[in-house]
């Protein structure tokens, strides 16, 4: 089952890492109410951040997806408040 949630936070940075098998993994750093952390994100969200459409240290609304089948959480959308 997939559960969708939205929250407000401050975008800090996004990065891509390539694993040993050649798969690329995308993550973004977000500050939410004074707690900062790194969260997985989709390639589309990563590309949006790299294009400059999402500015560092600005506040946004993030859409997250919890996938209970795989026990994963990732950001699947970012939009202006």
Residues of each region from the PLM?
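OB-fold (S1/OB) nucleic-acid-binding surfaces
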Residues: 19-43
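A short, sequence-level motif marking secondary-structure junctions
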Residues: 42-48, 79-81
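Structural detector for short beta-strands of small beta-barrel domains
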Residues: 2-22
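Short nucleic-acid-contacting surface segments enriched for D/E, G, S/T with interspersed K/R
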Residues: 45-63
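Short coil/turn motifs at secondary-structure junctions
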Residues: 14, 33, 67-69
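OB-fold and OB-like beta-barrel modules that bind single-stranded nucleic acids
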Residues: 6-11, 57-66
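OB-fold/S1-family single-stranded nucleic acid-binding modules
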Residues: 65-81
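Acidic, two-metal ion nucleic-acid-processing modules in DNA metabolism proteins
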Residues: 2-6, 26, 37, 60, ...
């Amino acid at each position: 089952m997939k559960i969708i949630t939205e929250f407000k936070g401050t975008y800090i940075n996004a990065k891509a890492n390539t694993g040993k098998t050649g798969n690329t993994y995308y993550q973004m750093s977000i500050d939410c109410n004074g707690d900062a952390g790194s969260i997985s994100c989709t390639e589309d969200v990563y590309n949006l951040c790299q294009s400059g459409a999402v500015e560092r240290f600005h506040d946004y609304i993030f859409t997250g997806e919890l996938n209970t089948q795989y026990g994963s959480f990732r950001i699947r959308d970012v939009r202006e408040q």
